């Protein structure tokens, strides 16, 4: 509404209320107009203003249409890229060898449920999915298999997985090794996407027929690193030797009812205590297959022997199911010092990055930097330890059971394994799980 019309409306109000309005010279011609005359004049003026208002409205509408069109154009520009169609690409079955430091991960195997830390496999498969080597995170989609599962905190140096991945070559071209240089550089591509504590070390482009990373493995080689301070290494070596051969290891593992395992016999090929330096040793263990937490349980018993809390022959007693049908209650050794050192397979053609390749040098430098990072932290920790007062533990009356983590477990009076309470037998654990599963499915 224009100022002029507002003045006319004000005049109308003055007339209707009978008040004496102060009128300007510009408005004096309307002083004696009646209410009806003023209304007619207002109507005339409003009608005269309409074309002007419609003109501006038309301009405003055009602006809105232009903005709307620009938004549509931008939306098209930001449109999601076309979905990658795996059916239009060749695939091939390969094996990958890799190493990882386990303390930043929630174990090797990818999990269906949420985990507080990422898993090693999950990290690798996410990298593969990102660069379109695999179509999804569903393992069954590409014949996935792993050699040896490792738990949270445990590392591996020569872990192996086998799976089907995208390829640049046809089936016929894949059979000819002269075409390998035209293949996707799997090691380089993945290492560019993976964190520094997971590294692909080699690829086998043509695994043996019917190869499976789990079932084709001949044996697995573990190492458990420990500080030899206050331990009788000779006794530990004797106890370790008793593990060799086929033995029942139900008292050296964590029972898992979901697996419904009834055969706990496993073959140990080699079991030794080896020196690494003046301070550190390793429990060096080679076997065909292992049970859940088996190595950590074996190491826990070796620590008890090394502290002279148990005799070396306790190994023979615990592997004799007639004498010890149920596992005594004891704590496993710490997870961090354990590593899956190697996985032995039939002869395979592993292709490693060439040492003079720029990318290989780049990844080697990153690994050296990571190693230096931990060495510097260790050096700082040693200085930290040296500047702090040291307590005299010689008069400490309680026993500290060595678990490999430097802290151990404090107990008032040590109870021999043969005198401890025992865990439920295998048959009960399996039956409980089966009953629970059946009730859930009803």
From Swiss-Prot:
- Can you name a GO cellular component term? cytoplasm
Q: Does the keyword Isomerase apply?
A: yes
The answer to whether UniProt assigns keyword Chloroplast to this entry is: no
As recorded in UniProt, its EC number(s) are: 5.4.99.45
User: Which top-level group of life is the source organism from?
Assistant: Eukaryota
- Which residues are named in the active-site annotation? 151 (nucleophile)
Designated name of the protein = tRNA pseudouridine(38/39) synthase
What organism is this sequence from? Saccharomyces cerevisiae (strain ATCC 204508 / S288c)
